[in-house]
Amino acid sequence: MRRVVVTGMGVVSPIGMGVKNFCKALFLGKNGIGKITHFDPSSYRSRIAGEVKNFDPYRYLPPKEVRRMDRFTQLGMVAAEEAVREAEITDEDNDPATIGVLVGSGVGGLGTIEREQTILLQKGPGRVSPFLVPMLITDITSALIAIKYGFSGPNFSVSTACATGNHSIGEAFKIIQRGDAEIMIAGGTEAAITPLGVAGFCSMRALSTRNEHPEKASRPFDKERDGFVIGEGAGVVVLEELDRARKRSAPIWGEITGFGMSEDAYHITQPVSDGRGIRQAMNKALEDAKVSPREVDYINAHGTSTPFNDKAETQAIKDVFGRKAYQIPVSSTKSMTGHLLGATGGVELIASLLALRDGIVPPTINYENPDPECDLDYVPNKAREVKIKIAMSNSMGFGGHNAVLVVKKF
């Protein structure tokens, strides 16, 4: 079986632009949640979010391209550029037909839809942008990355709500394993902090309403959690066949060893209460990686800060790991970033790889009130030095989609 390693990483997040800044903030337990500034949220139940601060797309992308991209694509392009640059991919030692792209989004160009709908109503159909459709479709980021670099290998997108990033990376991993590509650029990107997007989540009663103290709002596994905090960002990695990476002396961050996925088949938004869906995906990922539960040293939990999700995921971890569940550090970086929806998997895999590299587990901040039904070691409030050889990263999405990755220190 062909082995697959990570040779590049790129991240745009509410706690830092670029891997270096993200890493520093991650281990310091930096809060990235604040009042919404993208629009006036004064009439909303939830008025807080994990926004990417001071993001100016014109600093990174040509002006003409910026005007033809939704924000979710802009974020994804910047993350991909960092990942490709750090992987040191050059034209000289790579056939573009062997390089593919799989970068997904859970929502796509929602901001563009809202803007163009307003133009339609106010000025008529003739004034709607001819770039509306390519700006809103979820596969456009994959396409634009390929166009920019000339990568002509496998190219598509995945959209499985909050499991999108993990599904994208997992499928890219399998594409390389079976020999359909040598290198895949994979991950997720999202920018859904828009009037309509936030209104929809508010109507579902899914979001935290801790508006007066936004820095305390995202509190996974805490007894006082009251919903997730919407965020935005992008996480993109470069996956590469091991021998190919070694041949060109590429930097190696870690090895992807397992991928598992499943479907709750239960409810459109709520996870099944006993966690059997994510449990099935975790077991499949371990089986795929040929790893026993006792070998896992860290779990980057989905941990959304919602009453249902955190309880179900905790139960699933107990079912999979038995007594070992109480000995494994389990943390949710959403406590710092908020919930990045389709970008979550990519950003959290990067967090897991940084934990492997540095031997430091990022904390779950705002963990103050233990919940009897969430009683694992959630690495409360402060990062911890831990020898990590194998890590697991969980993602769960609306619709009951579950995707789990297992990564190994290289």
Which stretches of residues belong to each language-model region?
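ACP-dependent fatty acid/polyketide chain-elongation machinery
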Residues: 1-65, 87, 243-253, 350-364, ...
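Condensing-enzyme catalytic core mediating Claisen C-C bond formation in acyl metabolism
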Residues: 3-7, 34, 212-289, 298
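Conserved small-residue
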Residues: 8, 26, 80, 101, ...
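Conserved catalytic cysteine-centered active-site region
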Residues: 34-78, 108-171, 180, 203-229, ...
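Short, well-ordered amphipathic alpha-helical segments that serve as non-catalytic structural scaffolds
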Residues: 76-87, 141, 168, 240-242, ...
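Active-site-proximal alpha-helical scaffold in enzymes
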Residues: 76-89, 146-190, 228-250, 339-361, ...
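Glycine-/small-residue-rich "gating" segment that lines the acyl/pantetheine channel
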Residues: 122-129, 170, 174, 191-247, ...
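Acyl-CoA/ACP chain-elongation machinery
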Residues: 180-226, 259-273, 303-310, 327-377
